[in-house]
Amino acid sequence: MQAVKCVIVGDGAVGKTCLLISYTTNAFPNEYIPTVFDNYSATVMVDSKPINLGLWDTAGQEDYDRLRPLSYPQTDVFLICFSVVSPPSFDNVSSKWQPEVSHHCPKTPCLLVGTKLDMREDKEQLKRLEEKKITPITTEQGEAKCKDIGAVKYIECSALTQKNLRLVFDEAVRAVISPAGGAKKDKKNNRGCLLF
């Protein structure tokens, strides 16, 4: 069975851990606790193929900038996450996360993931954003950022409602087992990211 290592990166509090917990347990955590989610492994079916999917959560806070890359070796695909209701987290995709990932793992595919999709229409959230004179990130902005950073796909999702949640992880697996460029990766000779 093919194994796929998927590492999730992005600013603190954009919903990375909620994404993983909702996907793996079908339950949404009610409180924010900075990353305590351990590595998770599950057998999933993608395009009728069994895949051993390893999910690695990372801390987004600056305090962990030197430790976070230790989880990158052997990564097959990255999910670069931002919250659609946090323009600063969106800006950090191109100023921090894509440069960090491409520095350590230049040939590893990335998906851009807009989280908290359910909050884009939330009246309370929109009021808070309006008070700060900012607006939610649009789908078009996400798609443009995807092209700008060279990500293979842009997907918006909600861990709360689970809208597009499974799609995020299915597409992450597809980026590894069926890359758009044609030939599949030879797992023996090209195993994702290597750090020396």
Swiss-Prot record:
EC number assigned by the record: 3.6.5.2
Motif Switch 1 location, chain numbering: 26-37
Extent of motif Switch 2: 57-75
Record's function text: Small GTPase which cycles between active GTP-bound and inactive GDP-bound states. Involved in cytoskeleton remodeling. Plays a role in phagocytosis of bacteria and host erythrocytes. Involved in capping of surface receptors. May be involved in cytokinesis.
Reactions this protein catalyses: GTP + H2O = GDP + phosphate + H(+)
Protein name listed in UniProt: Rho-related protein racA
Gene that this sequence comes from: RACA
Main location group: membrane
Molecular-function annotations in GO: GTP binding; GTPase activity; metal ion binding; protein kinase binding
Regulation: Regulated by guanine nucleotide exchange factors (GEFs) which promote the exchange of bound GDP for free GTP, GTPase activating proteins (GAPs) which increase the GTP hydrolysis activity, and GDP dissociation inhibitors which inhibit the dissociation of the nucleotide from the GTPase.
Cofactor(s) this protein requires: Mg(2+)
Lipid attachment in record (S-geranylgeranyl cysteine): 193
CDD domains: Rac1_like (cd01871)
Assigned keywords, A-Z: Cell membrane, Cytoplasm, Cytoskeleton, GTP-binding, Hydrolase, Lipoprotein, Magnesium, Membrane, Metal-binding, Methylation, Nucleotide-binding, Phagocytosis, Prenylation
Highest taxon listed in the record's lineage: Eukaryota
Residues given in the record as Mg(2+) binding sites: 17, 35
Organism, as annotated: Entamoeba histolytica (strain ATCC 30459 / HM-1:IMSS / ABRM)
Quaternary structure note: Interacts (GTP-bound form) with PAK2 (via CRIB domain).
